[in-house]
């Protein structure tokens, strides 16, 4: 979605 924190280190 719009979660930069989640997309950060995936």
UniProtKB/Swiss-Prot annotation:
Record's keyword terms, sorted: Disulfide bond, Protease inhibitor, Serine protease inhibitor
Keyword Oxidoreductase: no
A biological-process GO annotation: negative regulation of serine-type endopeptidase activity
GO molecular function, one term: serine-type endopeptidase inhibitor activity
UniProt entry tagged with the keyword Metal-binding: no
Role summary: Inhibits trypsin (IC(50)=2.7 nM) and alpha-chymotrypsin (IC(50)=322 nM).
Assigned protein family: Belongs to the Bowman-Birk serine protease inhibitor family.
Subunit structure: Dimer.
Name listed for the protein in its UniProt record: Bowman-Birk type proteinase inhibitor 1a
Organism the protein comes from: Lathyrus sativus
